[in-house]
Amino acid sequence: MIDLRLLRDDPERLRASQRARGEDPGLVDAALAADENRRAAVARFEALRAEQKALGRRIASAPPDEKPALLDRAKELAELVKAAEAARDDADAACREALLAISNLVDDEAPRGGEEDFVVLEEIGTPPTFSFPPRDHLELGERLGAIDVERAAKVSGSRFYYLTGVGALLEFALVDLALRQAVTAGFVPVIPPVLVRPPAMEGTGFLGQAAENVFHLEKDDFYLVGTSEVSLAAYHMGEILDAAQLPRRYVGFSTCFRREAGSHGKDTRGIIRVHQFDKVEMFSFTTVGEAAAEHRRLLEWEKQFLTALEIPFRVIDVATGDLGASAARKFDCEAWIPTQGRYREVTSTSNCTEFQARRLDIRMRDEQGIRPLATLNGTLVAIPRTIVAVLENHQQADGSVVVPRALRDYLGTDVLRPKR
């Protein structure tokens, strides 16, 4: 949620942010109007309540001949106070809804523009050149006995998959490597719930523009998380944290669920875009002043992981028009996919500043009092796309795949060989 003081003091800054995102700046004006209405409703309620209290004192000391008229007024005031209280509550709820509709204030340094206006910050590693026609990840995975989408389609429909044999072992190896790296860096490992209630989903910003990609269990009013960011952010919902103990860093492993609405016809082959996948996610609670530096640290941990897998990748600074509602700035790591001849996103890290913390009522206490804090998230490994990158970049002419050195102890082999 945006800072109400910012809305009142500098609404044009918020309008400019909305325009930079390609979103409606009129939402800012709607929020201003809702705030004015709320303040007027609060003032009317408080004035009537004050009159009611004063009248109560008068009645207590009034002579008998004056009491009937005063009691009539007291009855009238009681009805007015009740109506004013309801109007205040309605105005407060409407103001909150108006504030929730506005996305986070974009970072001044985030590049402006749409999806294709990102800025490449660096390229790490060199895309491989093959002396043979490279196979895509699905063909490699099927030959290795690692990926089965045909049976998954029979069981669950499109955009599902089985990881079998070395495919399943490869997932466990990647998760183990990611968790060991994160724990070494000081993260607390967490296995969070994947079913959450509306306040957690709304608080993290996934019930606005992203709502169409969320699975909702309507009967029980649960949501399936698309990332453990949701569960990890809400872990301290309604709490006040000691600033001296920040940053608090958690690394969560969970299954993630996405409807992929609007993706019809995109990435229909293989496991690049699926409805269900596993992911290791970093999450940090820190001070607002440390948020930008923490963002860079999360990015460095992502780069460290991909470098260990010997995958060529690049880092991009995502343009404002491609940011999620909660992110003020986002960096993506994109791995080279040989058969597509382009880079594809495999990890991302976002600085959400105070936005999620305000919505989730998470604050910190320091010598200056109780204040908002910042939240940040970063993918350490999203399993399907990382497997895609590993298989395609490390393939050999016979369809075998060289195992990255960082995974060999876990897998117990240097090379994954075709079963057919």
Curated annotation (Swiss-Prot):
Binding residues for ATP: 258-260, 274, 345-348
Pathway annotation: Aminoacyl-tRNA biosynthesis; selenocysteinyl-tRNA(Sec) biosynthesis; L-seryl-tRNA(Sec) from L-serine and tRNA(Sec): step 1/1
Enzyme kind, highest EC tier: ligase
Family annotation (CDD domains): SerRS_core
Subcellular location field: Cytoplasm
Keyword Protein biosynthesis: yes
Ligand binding (L-serine): 227-229, 281, 379
GO molecular function: ATP binding; serine-tRNA ligase activity
GO CC terms of this entry: cytoplasm
SUPFAM superfamilies assigned to the protein according to its UniProt record, in alphabetical order: Class II aaRS and biotin synthetases, tRNA-binding arm
E.C. numbers: 6.1.1.11
Keyword annotations: Aminoacyl-tRNA synthetase, ATP-binding, Cytoplasm, Ligase, Nucleotide-binding, Protein biosynthesis
Similarity comment text for this entry: Belongs to the class-II aminoacyl-tRNA synthetase family. Type-1 seryl-tRNA synthetase subfamily.
Reported function: Catalyzes the attachment of serine to tRNA(Ser). Is also able to aminoacylate tRNA(Sec) with serine, to form the misacylated tRNA L-seryl-tRNA(Sec), which will be further converted into selenocysteinyl-tRNA(Sec).
Subunit structure: Homodimer. The tRNA molecule binds across the dimer.
UniProt protein name: Serine--tRNA ligase
